[in-house]
Amino acid sequence: LFPLLSLTVQRIADHTVQDKITLGGNICGTIIYKEGLLPLLVSDSYAVVADYRGLRNIPVKDIFQRELKLNEEEFIVSFVIRRCYTELPYLHAKRTKSDKINYPLITLAAILEGNKVKMAFSGLCRYPIRSVTMEDWLNSSSLPEALRIQYALKSVPDFILEDLEGSASYRRFLLESMLHEVSSKLGV
């Protein structure tokens, strides 16, 4: 079992199929949040992809870049997560407008590998993201925490989402708070 994945998918943001969706359904579906993808991104997981030639393992980060990058004849059979990632310290945080099970303003999944944090977000942009640049800034131990967080905030790789759930400035405020939480709870 992968505790971070279990925790993240418990509160999937899809009102139409609550408690009935598979991990593959969440990731391959049309909803933009795809929260089930976050733990797979931070754990450098692989997707087992099938097509007419057989099965192959593809890094999750390679088949999901802003959107799912599968050919028409391909489908995901399963995911491979190295055991070492299932035992690392982790943090899951979800901020919603009103309810525990709702579309996220931001969902965060983070793990601490060695003394480096890896983190992925849903609801921050129009698609789930893992930004190595944001991680590098947050992991820059030579800088004070406040400066690391400010540089990480400036490194969000795309426009911050603005929709009926919340404004871009509010999401940025939440992101800053969540980065402080990552720093304090995972000790970076």
Where are these regions (language model features)?
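C-terminal structural segment of proteins
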Residues: 1-188
